[in-house]
């Protein structure tokens, strides 16, 4: 993120298919603050993506959060993290969490965040199959389904497990209703989870709307073995 004398926002990315205009959350994040505070100078954003696109990992929200934080600091706007979160939710439900970070209980559309203790140290293996998923389509499909009570994760049980700092209990409380939609359409998601578990993951689950899968390991070698097998 660079400050420029020339007014306006310039966005460069390392991926040719990413938009470099107001269709990009990073661009919109800069515009949001600069317009509100009447910033006369410009900003140059060089975005190098590592988080896969359309992977259910809040990659765009992470970019936007970084830009909000950077523009606030660079131009001395004086906003607190809470104030940035209040603005960020206007752009995307995941942005407040990306600004707060850590472990949290997320309620509402994602803007109501309650900090929780960090989970115990472990290894996390992330695997994205060669497919992309539209979050909008997944949520629309979920809305059309009739969910039972047992389809929903045990949030209270998860919080208790986190407070007890028991990684096995935490993993045992995994749950993601969106997996009913995405994994039902793409069996490879369940296949990846199975490989991780067979190689020693305490549990594995789809991230967000998918298709990315993550597994928790307490043994670094087991995580490495799963990585090599996948």
Model-derived segments and spans:
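Residue-level signal for inorganic ion chemistry
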Residues: 1, 26, 60, 94, ...
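ATP-binding N-lobe of GHMP and related small-molecule kinases
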Residues: 1-55, 73, 77-85, 119, ...
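Structural signature of FAD isoalloxazine-binding scaffolds in flavoprotein oxidoreductases
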Residues: 1-5, 67, 98, 120-123
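Short, basic/glycine-rich phosphate-binding loops at helix/coil junctions
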Residues: 6-14, 19, 67, 164-174
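Contiguous, small/hydrophobic- and glycine-enriched helical/loop subdomains that border
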Residues: 42, 64, 68-105
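Glycine/serine-rich anion-binding loops at beta->alpha junctions
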Residues: 46-75, 93, 202-217
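Conserved, helical-rich catalytic subdomain that frames metal- and/or nucleotide-binding sites
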Residues: 100, 105-203, 218-228
């Amino acid at each position: 993120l660079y400050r420029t004398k020339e007014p306006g926002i310039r966005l460069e990315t390392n991926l040719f298919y990413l938009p470099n205009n107001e269709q990009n959350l990073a661009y919109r994040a800069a515009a949001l603050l600069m317009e509100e505070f009447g910033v006369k100078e410009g900003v140059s954003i060089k975005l190098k993506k590592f988080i896969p696109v359309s992977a259910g990992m809040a990659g765009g929200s992470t970019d936007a959060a970084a830009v909000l934080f950077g523009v606030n600091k660079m131009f001395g706007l004086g906003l607190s993290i809470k104030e940035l979160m209040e603005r960020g939710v206007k752009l995307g439900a995941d942005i407040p969490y990306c600004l707060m970070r850590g472990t949290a209980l997320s309620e509402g559309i994602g803007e109501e965040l309650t900090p929780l203790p960090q989970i115990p140290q472990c290894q996390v293996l992330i695997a994205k199959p060669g497919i992309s998923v539209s979050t909008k389509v997944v949520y629309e499909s979920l809305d059309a389904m009739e969910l039972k009570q047992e389809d929903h994760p045990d949030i209270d049980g998860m919080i208790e497990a986190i407070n007890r700092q028991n990684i096995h209990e935490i993993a045992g409380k995994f749950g993601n209703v969106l997996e009913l939609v995405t994994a039902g359409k793409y069996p490879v998601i369940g296949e990846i989870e199975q490989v991780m578990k067979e190689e020693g993951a305490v549990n594995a689950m789809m991230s967000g709307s998918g298709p990315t899968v993550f597994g928790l390991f307490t043994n670094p070698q087991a995580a490495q073995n799963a990585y090599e097998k996948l």
